[in-house]
Curated annotation (Swiss-Prot):
Residues 8-43, 44-79, 81-116, 117-149 form the EF-hand domain. This is Calmodulin. This protein has four functional calcium-binding sites. Ca(2+) 3 binds at residues 94, 96, 98, 105. One of its GO terms (cellular component) is myosin II complex. Disulfide bonds: none annotated. Coiled coil: none annotated. GO terms for molecular function: calcium ion binding.
Length: 149
């Protein structure tokens, strides 16, 4: 399944993996997974975190290594995000609930994830998703961005 990913996708997932892998040991533990989920405004229980890891933990060592992470991401991309998941993600970014994601809101969420972006990088991300050119991302643009592979 992971063999259907492009090199670009694999590079992106490598970056995402290192956001999760806080101590840089090459594996994601339930503790690290919990930290990232909470920074995204989620509040999973220990049991839910364990379930998430068990779903993809092919070698049964209780952690997720990069190949397992790739499998998980490939699987997630295949059953493309449900409407509800996309709406939920949009709400995480749209801090003030005005129906738009501004550069400041995007920067805030990315910083919470431990991803320090330059203003240029944030502006570039907004530009890529901002179809109508108003300088922010509305829900339709967000859906388009999330569902275009």
């Amino acid at each position: 399944m992971a063999d259907q990913l492009t090199e670009e996708q694999i590079a992106e997932f490598k970056e995402a993996f290192s956001l999760f892998d806080k101590d840089g040991d090459g594996t994601i533990t339930t503790k690290e997974l919990g930290t990232v989920m909470r920074s995204l405004g989620q509040n999973p229980t220990e049991a839910e975190l364990q379930d998430m890891i068990n779903e993809v933990d092919a070698d049964g060592d209780g952690t997720i290594d990069f190949p397992e992470f790739l499998t998980m991401m490939a699987r997630k991309m295949k059953d493309t995000d449900s409407e509800e998941e996309i709406r939920e993600a949009f709400r995480v970014f749209d801090k003030d609930g005005n129906g738009f994601i501004s550069a400041a809101e995007l920067r805030h969420v990315m910083t919470n994830l431990g991803e320090k972006l330059t203003d240029e990088e944030v502006d570039e991300m907004i530009r890529e998703a901002d179809i109508d050119g108003d300088g922010q991302v509305n829900y339709e643009e967000f859906v388009t961005m999330m569902t275009s592979k």
